[in-house]
Design a protein with these regions (language model features):
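A conserved beta-strand-to-alpha-helix junction within the catalytic ATP-binding
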Residues: 23-38
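Short helix N-cap motif at coil->helix boundaries in the Bergerat
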Residues: 29, 110-121
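Short helix-loop "hinge" at the ATP-lid/N-box region of the Bergerat-fold HATPase_c
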Residues: 79-80
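Short beta-strand/loop element within the Bergerat-fold HATPase_c
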Residues: 86-98
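Acidic ATP/Mg2+-coordinating residue in the GHKL
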Residues: 106
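Conserved glycine-rich
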Residues: 152-153
C-alpha cells in the first residue's frame, strides 16, 4: 500500500507540472479505454464483477495517452472496489458536440450528497474504514481531476446512496477525428 501511495504522489506531482501536455499526441479513446479495462479485469474477476463496455466511439483526442489511461483506470478501479460482489460496472464512450464523454457507472454504495463536492480533493475519503478495506489512498479522484483539467476537460459525478454512482469525464474532441483518418502515434 505504501508503494501505491508513493507512486500516486509522484503521478500527481507530474500532473501539476507547468506544461503537462508537452508530448501530446492523437489518442484513440477506444484503445485507451480498452487498455484501462484490461488492466482492471483481474480485480473485477476476483469480485465476480462484470465490466460491460458500450460501443466504440471511433474518435480521438489530443493528449497524453498514459495519463488518460491512468484516469480511466482509476475510475474503473474505484467502481469495482466500491461495488458489491457479483454486480456490473458499465463503461461508455459517447460524442456530444465538441466533447468526448467517458462514463463509468457502478451499482455500489453511492456517495452521500454532503461529500460530493469534496471527493476530488487530495486525500479526501468518504469512508476511511472502507478505504482501508479497498486499499485506496485518497488520491485517485484528484489525479483524475488533474488529468481532465490538463486536457481541457472536466469530471463530474452523479450519485445516490444505496444505488451507485456515475462518473463522467469530458474531454475536447479532436475535430474530424475519425481514427481511420488521424491514426494514433
Amino acid at each position: 500500500r505504501l508503494s501505491t501511495l508513493v507512486q500516486e504522489i509522484i503521478d500527481l506531482s507530474r500532473l501539476q507540472d507547468a506544461d503537462p501536455l508537452l508530448d501530446a499526441i492523437h489518442v484513440d479513446i477506444d484503445e485507451a479505454v480498452n487498455e484501462a479495462i484490461d488492466q482492471c479485469q483481474v480485480l473485477a474477476g476476483t469480485r465476480d464483477i462484470d465490466i460491460i463496455r458500450g460501443p466504440n466511439a471511433g474518435v480521438s483526442v489530443v493528449g497524453d495517452r498514459t495519463h488518460l489511461i491512468m484516469a480511466f483506470h482509476n475510475l474503473i478501479e474505484n467502481a469495482i472496489n466500491y461495488s458489491p460482489a457479483s454486480t456490473r460496472v458499465g463503461i461508455g464512450v459517447e460524442c456530444r458536440e465538441d466533447l468526448v464523454e467517458f462514463t463509468v457507472t457502478d451499482q455500489g454504495v453511492g456517495i452521500p450528497e454532503k461529500d460530493l463536492e469534496r471527493i476530488f480533493e487530495r486525500f479526501y475519503r468518504v469512508d476511511p474504514a472502507r478505504s482501508r478495506e479497498t486499499g485506496g489512498t485518497g488520491l485517485g479522484l484528484s489525479i483524475v481531476k488533474h488529468v481532465a483539467g490538463n486536457h481541457g476537460g472536466d469530471i463530474s459525478v452523479w450519485s445516490l446512496e444505496g444505488q451507485g454512482s456515475t462518473f463522467t469525464l469530458r474531454l475536447p474532441r479532436l475535430k474530424d477525428s475519425s481514427i481511420a483518418s488521424t491514426g494514433t502515434e
